[in-house]
């Protein structure tokens, strides 16, 4: 059985991971769940997955989270220091799904204490990529991208000789222009292009 930590369990990637783990309970043991502000979802996930440690990033919500989990035997903490402490708990797999720069420090710490760092936090590579990769090498931690586009590239290159790859062309999924007629694409403005239906561009 593999021990797992999920950072950002109430976000998009974290929620998908939780769904998968609920169907694989015999293969995985969730040790750590962390969320940002969504205490109801975090409490629900905790009751289903029964992690040892639960962390809410927003320390002001710690009391409310504890109230939702009265009667359950969890180590419940809150705030940045609690997140960083949770990242230092040794696990087989650490999923880093915290959004934005807030996830960088957790990724750097988790790289020291996990066998596999499943990275959805792009900022960790953009802001600290050289350091993160060095920490992974020093600790024999596998760095696996799990965010959509990065994971697709990783999967395509798996088993290939990277030295033979001259360039990678990554096509878009459509964004705001998925159903736009070809003739109408000629008049698209930058403002329209940044109006993605799901993500703030």
Regions found by a protein language model. Give the residues of each.
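Short acidic-hydrophobic, aromatic-tinged amphipathic segments that line or gate anion-handling sites
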Residues: 55-57, 75-82
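Active-site-proximal loop->helix
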Residues: 16-25, 44-45, 125-140, 156-159
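A short helix->loop->beta-strand "cap" motif at the edges of active sites that frequently abuts
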Residues: 2, 50-53, 72-74, 113-116, ...
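N-terminal Rossmann-like dinucleotide-binding module
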Residues: 1-53
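Conserved anion/nucleotide-ligand pocket segment
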Residues: 150-201
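Residue-level signal for inorganic ion chemistry
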Residues: 10, 46, 94, 114, ...
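Rossmann-fold NAD(P)-binding glycine/threonine-rich loop
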Residues: 65, 101-113, 122-141
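Beta-loop-alpha module in the N-terminal Rossmann-like domain of NAD(P)-dependent dehydrogenases
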Residues: 78-110
